C-alpha cells in the first residue's frame, strides 16, 4: 500500500518510475535507513539533484515521521531551506528528490577559511534567522537546529547557508509539542524539563550556534549527560576570558537574549533580526579565525557534543537519578532521625 497519496506535483502520481526520470550516479551519503544518490534529470540534461532512497523494510513503524517530514518540506519554499522537488513511492523504496547542496558543513568550511570575522558570523546567523523566522510564520518548528544541519549551498566564497534535515520538525497544528527530542548541547531547557514548548526552542539552538561561531567551543559541555543537562536547565554558561575579550559587547548581548532560560522572555526570530548585531554595524571586523579554528578543530574531534541522542531515554535516566537521590536522602533522614536539606537532582 502506498505511503503517500500523491507526489509533490498537483496532478495524480504518474506511472513512470524514478529511474525512468533520473539517471542515478554516485552515492553521496549513507544513513541507517537510507542512501543519498547524485542523480541527473533525463528531461533536463545537466540538472543535478540529491535523491534520498529509503528502504521500506527499515522504515516500518516510522512511516508517520517520514510523512511529517514530507508534509513540512512541501509547505516550505525559502531561499535558505533545502527544497523537496518530488517524491516517488515504489515497491521497495521511497525516494525523495531534493535540491543538491554541495558546499559542505558550516563548521568545516569555517575551519578551512583563511580569515573569518565577527561580521561573517553575524551574516551567517542572519540567514539562519530569516529562514527559521519563515518556518515559524508558517507554523513549523524545526526542533533539531545544529551545525550539521547548516550547509553551504556551493563552494563559492559568498555561498548562502541552507537549512536541512526536517526529520524532527513539527507543525503547530499537529498538537501540543512536549516530546523530548533534539541533540545534546543544542536542546532548550524547557524540552529537558518536559514542559510543553514551541518556536522558542529553535531560537535557543540558534543562540548556541552563534556562541560557537564566535569562540569555537560550545557554551555547555560535560562528559556526563546529566551534568550537561543540568548546565542547560540552569543556563550556566560564561563568556570566558581571554577568548571572549576580542568579541563585541553587542554580540554577547545578542546571545544572552537568545539563550534566555525563560522561553517567554527569549527573543523571537524577528526580535533577533532587529538586534544591532544583526541589523546594525556593531559586529567587529577584525580577524578571529585563528582562535575560533583551533577550538573548532578540538570540538569537532571530540564529537561528543555533536552526537544524536534519544532525548526521551536521557530524561528517563535523569528521572531515575532524581528518584535515587531522593531515596538516599530519605534513608539518611530515617537513620539520623533529623531533617536534611533536599539533594539536588543535577550536579553541574
Swiss-Prot record:
- Cite the record's Pro residues compositional bias ranges: 339-348
| Keywords of the record | Allosteric enzyme, ATP-binding, Calmodulin-binding, Cytoplasm, Developmental protein, Kinase, Magnesium, Metal-binding, Nucleotide-binding, Nucleus, Phosphoprotein, Serine/threonine-protein kinase, Transferase
Give positions of region: Disordered: 327-348
Cellular component terms (Gene Ontology) = cytoplasm; nucleus
Q: Its Enzyme Commission number?
A: 2.7.11.17
Protein location: Nucleus; Cytoplasm
Q: Drop me one GO molecular function for this one.
A: metal ion binding
Q: Where is this region: Calmodulin-binding?
A: 298-319
PROSITE patterns, A to Z: PROTEIN_KINASE_ATP, PROTEIN_KINASE_DOM, PROTEIN_KINASE_ST
Q: Where is this motif: Nuclear localization signal 3?
A: 297-307
Q: Which reaction does it catalyse?
A: L-seryl-[protein] + ATP = O-phospho-L-seryl-[protein] + ADP + H(+); L-threonyl-[protein] + ATP = O-phospho-L-threonyl-[protein] + ADP + H(+)
Ranges for domain Protein kinase = 22-278
Q: What happens when the gene is disrupted?
A: Changes in thermosensory behavior and temperature-dependent defects in AFD-specific gene expression. Decreased threshold for temperature-evoked activity in the AFD neurons. Defects in negative thermotaxis and isothermal tracking behaviors. Defective in thermal avoidance adaptation. Aberrant thermotaxis at innocuous temperatures. Inappropriate dauer formation under well-fed conditions. Reduced expression of growth promoting daf-7 in ASI sensory neurons. Changes in thermosensory response of AIY neurons. Increases response to acute thermosensory stimuli.
What residues make up the catalytic site? 144 (proton acceptor)
State the activity regulation. Activated by Ca(2+)/calmodulin. Binding of calmodulin results in a conformational change that generates functional binding sites for both substrate and ATP, and thus relieves autoinhibition and lowers the Km of substrate binding. Must be phosphorylated by ckk-1 to be maximally active but this does not appear to be required for activity in AFD neurons.
Task: Output compositional bias ranges, type Polar residues.
Answer: 327-338
Q: In which tissues is it expressed?
A: Expressed in head and tail neurons and vulval muscles. Throughout the nervous system. Detected in neurites and neuronal cell bodies. Expressed in the mechanosensory neurons, AVM and ALM, and in the interneurons, AVA, AVB and AVD. Expressed in the right and left ASE neurons where it functions cell-autonomously to control salt-avoidance learning. Expressed in FLP and AFD thermosensory neurons.
Sequence motif Nuclear localization signal 2, residues: 71-78
- What SMART domains would the database entry show? S_TKc
What's the record's remark on domains?
A: The autoinhibitory domain overlaps with the calmodulin binding region and interacts in the inactive folded state with the catalytic domain as a pseudosubstrate. Nuclear export signal is required for cytoplasmic accumulation in unstimulated FLP neurons which occurs in an exportin-dependent manner.
Protein family: Belongs to the protein kinase superfamily. CAMK Ser/Thr protein kinase family. CaMK subfamily.
- Oligomeric form and interacting partners: Interacts with importin ima-3; affinity for ima-3 is increased in the presence of Ca(2+) and calmodulin and leads to increased nuclear accumulation of cmk-1 in FLP neurons upon prolonged heat activation.
Write the protein's name. Calcium/calmodulin-dependent protein kinase type 1
Source organism per UniProt: Caenorhabditis elegans
The lineage, from the top, is: Eukaryota, Metazoa, Ecdysozoa, Nematoda, Chromadorea
